[in-house]
């Protein structure tokens, strides 16, 4: 489901004013959220943000202090977990070690007293879906981590839930396998057409898999949007710093026009100019966020640089990360700015020797890249 489709559709899951307290502490603080059918929706936040507590309330494992959970028009707030058309796949997978793969998948169906012929057909269907048919007779300990993840997914989908909850679904896998499995999991969920809500602290996982992301902190929603929205258009300093890397400058608006604005930033000798006007008057305080990948790096000062959007500094650190490098540039006032340079960057510019430690360099950025963040 695209963001455009979601915005015009009727919400499939409605979370209305949900609150959960432990003592005097709000684990979830008045959450309102609409999730649409066939979405893969990510709850993203650091430890203690409230994302897992929210997931547990959706599953029925925690009872809210107030608020409602409406699924497909039905109020399920007070339903027991086993009465909800919701299944959860945990990070540990929770496979029964004494059962075979096919027995694990069939377990929930047997609990529901489904006829044996239908169980066998459903198990076979799930095994084909996750491409694990030839492993049907194996026990969990005879499978790799990635294979166990597939079986846990198949078992979760076997009952055809209206909502599938994923609790750190790939957290038990190593990084390389996790990256490979992300797209496999998305493909499987899209084939089935199930609405999915996943909890993760892994930004890359959320950005890769989710249709939309809700960023949580201190039990509250900080921003909800598509992966590109929350990365390119953060609505607060918290979101800008939480998603990816960024350079944050304290600033004050000194010019504000219909089609551009000029901001004086602490630590930058030259002002920052952006290609659009800002709401509100001049002289308002704000922050300016500039992503490292949006900052160009030069050994010599380009002739076209004018009065805005550039600075001079010294290379203090270089982190080589294969396909790109992160340069830490120390400015005259001691402020350090990060610039992310792709591997072919210097080759394209016919520069044989890239800048190195303690070398003077120049950085610049286009007018459309700085993001103003109001206080």
PLM feature spans:
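ABC ATPase nucleotide-binding domains
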Residues: 40, 81-241
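The feature captures the beta-strand-to-loop junction immediately N-terminal to the Walker
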Residues: 44-46
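Helix-to-loop junction immediately C-terminal to a conserved catalytic motif
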Residues: 59
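Conserved coupling/switch loops of ABC nucleotide-binding domains, chiefly the family-specific signature
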Residues: 65-68, 118, 218, 250
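Conserved ABC transporter NBD signature motif
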Residues: 67-75
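Non-catalytic connector elements of ABC transporters
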Residues: 246, 256-375
